[in-house]
Amino acid sequence: MDILKKSLFLVLFLGLVSLSICEEEKRENEDEEKQEDDEQSEMKRALWKTMLKKLGTVALHAGKAALGAAADTISQGAQ
């Protein structure tokens, strides 16, 4: 009976150690995935910022061109 108890305790101990190692690896994998997600979101944010900046520049030039065309039309109508 004593040998059976020792064997059972050994099996339980090894199982707990194995479970602990698996949990640690799982935690590390989750941390790596979170870090990758953070990096991707930063890249997306930078891309959107660049796109919006360029779009704003294009809109500004288009607005200036439209105002210039309107001013030309008004000045031609006044002549």
UniProtKB/Swiss-Prot annotation:
The keyword Secreted applies. Pfam families: DD_K, FSAP_sig_propep. InterPro entries: Dermaseptin_dom (IPR022731), Frog_antimicrobial_propeptide (IPR004275), FSAP (IPR016322). GO terms for biological process: defense response to bacterium; innate immune response. Keywords: Amidation, Amphibian defense peptide, Antibiotic, Antimicrobial, Cleavage on pair of basic residues, Coiled coil, Immunity, Innate immunity, Secreted, Signal. The modification Glutamine amide is found at Q76. GO terms for cellular component: extracellular region. Residues 23-45, 78-79 form a propeptide. It is found in: Secreted. Its main location: secreted. Residues 1-22 form the signal peptide. Expressed by the skin glands. Potent antimicrobial peptide with activity against bacteria, fungi and protozoa. Probably acts by disturbing membrane functions with its amphipathic structure. Belongs to the frog skin active peptide (FSAP) family. Dermaseptin subfamily. This is Dermaseptin-S8. It comes from Phyllomedusa sauvagei.
